[in-house]
Amino acid sequence: MKIWENLIEDTKKIIPSDVQCEIKMINSIDSLTRFANSHIHQNVEEEMTDLYLTFHSDGKTTNLNFNITSLGSIDEVVKKALSEIENNPKDSSWSGLASKENSYDGYRNLSPENPDLRAQKVKDFIDQGGSFNGAGYCSSNVSNVFVWNTNGLSSSDTATSAFLDGIFRSETSSGSSHLGHKTLKNIDGEKVGQEAYSIAKESQNPQDIDPGVYEVILGPDAVSTILVFLAVYGFNAKSKVDGTSPIEIDTEQFDKKITLVDDPHKEGALNFKIDASGSPKAQTEIITNGVPKSYFHTRRTSTELNEKNTFHEMFGWGDSFGGLGTNLYLQPGGISKDEMISNVKKGIYINEFWYCRV
């Protein structure tokens, strides 16, 4: 992108030779179609470009964030950063900048998805609901990231995503379903609608159950929620640094059937293939046969824990958040959901957990 190229050229001219600098730019186009009462009522699109700058000099660090519309002169930004550095404390866990050899070229000049296609996906969903009331949204996104630093690294990547999320309601029940993919054309609106309708229909006129011991089967959404919380609060190395993570590497903490990997290169994987340092991501072994194998590391956490960096630094979150795996894959078992249910004598099926917070 021309605006990025010009920014870096201008920055190179004014950065003092004894200052380490890293600049990241995120450009995203978010498109959204919303529906309620089984009718589309909103169609919007928003483009944003944000900049994240890090400066390090004399053992001190400062970070500055700007929206591109409020950037002004890069010369003034550098002056502001150098002034702030003088008043900052020493950064004892500074881990440096990514090397030039880590550069990655993944930028693609892509256009947003057609809103008519989002509308068609919504129609496909609504058509499955019969007399039930439908609501939800269909979204699509194109995001580009660029990373440059004074070590000579120059990286870029492009990621796309599309989601259809909907719910059907009867007088006594509701059923929801959603699906995500890299492109809208791979979203099956009929399938999503059929699943939501089936859940709403089968859960009509619910009855209380007696307290007791029940076998529990978790649906994919419920399992995904558990994995997200494990990733953020367990395998995030920042949680380990802070002493809040329950995860112990190379200690059997899960059932032996549990194997979990983070793989940004798996077919259909969403999100970027570089982390916020500009370095390429790789498949990471998280749990193998019930045994934790790795935390999600950033440059800073790998330095603080003296462990290998796994390159899971998040764009836009800064050092305070830590690392996060964004392409988690749980190794499947050997039987289907229907087979599992048929083997249960007294049990509960949980489709999703509701409103989970920490």
Regions found by a protein language model. Give the residues of each.
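Acidic low-complexity segments
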Residues: 3-8, 12, 19-32, 72-157, ...
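Residue-level structural signal for beta-strand termini and adjacent loop
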Residues: 66-69, 180, 298-300
